[in-house]
């Protein structure tokens, strides 16, 4: 069992005034090894996000949130792991509109490692979101984590390989699909040098 409390904040002076952000939360994590092959992890977070902008009143929010994330993992060897995960979140903005979001997320993660060569990982998630306010606002973007109400799908692939003694290449691909929206694909490549 692990408990932590964090308070992360920033205040930036822009040409039109200050932009202040604050995120405080309590995080409780439990891990239980059912056997050598199976384990369960549960994380619960209770927190508050605040944003105050001098120049854009539409960017002001004060969100109370709760989320719990159970993960069931199967790892038959050090080279392979598969995990089934869920996440349930509730968020509420303390304003006149009282925006509320409920997010249900179910997914699967795979990881395969080859010693001295590289690793491959993939994930797929189904996310259902209920939201009671307008989608075209910065508050909605923050509360819905960039997704839309209704059913959403997200997925990703990552390949990481050591190409030389001090060089590593990372290839990644991410996709997402929301109801009544086109599929969005993005990818990237990164080359790292270690000195």
Task: Give the label of every model feature segment.
Residues 1-195:
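Exposed, low-structure sequence patches enriched in small/polar residues
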């Amino acid at each position: 069992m692990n408990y932590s409390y964090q308070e992360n904040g920033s205040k930036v002076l822009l040409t039109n005034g200050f932009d202040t952000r604050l995120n405080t939360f309590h995080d409780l994590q439990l891990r239980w090894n059912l056997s050598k092959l199976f384990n369960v992890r549960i994380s619960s977070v209770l927190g508050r996000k605040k944003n105050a902008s001098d120049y854009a009143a539409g960017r002001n929010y004060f969100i109370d949130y709760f989320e719990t994330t159970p993960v069931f993992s199967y790892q038959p060897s050090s080279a392979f792991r598969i995990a089934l995960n869920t996440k349930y979140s509730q968020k509420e903005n303390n304003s006149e509109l009282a925006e509320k979001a409920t997010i249900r997320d179910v997914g699967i993660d795979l990881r395969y490692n080859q010693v001295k060569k590289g690793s491959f990982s993939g994930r797929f998630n189904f996310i259902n979101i209920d939201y009671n306010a307008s989608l075209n606002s910065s508050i909605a973007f923050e509360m819905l984590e960039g997704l839309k109400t209704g059913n959403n799908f997200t997925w990703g692939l990552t390949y990481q390989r050591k190409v030389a003694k001090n060089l590593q290449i990372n290839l990644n691909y991410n996709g997402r699909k929301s109801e009544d929206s086109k599929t969005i694909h993005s990818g990237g490549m990164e080359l790292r040098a270690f000195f």
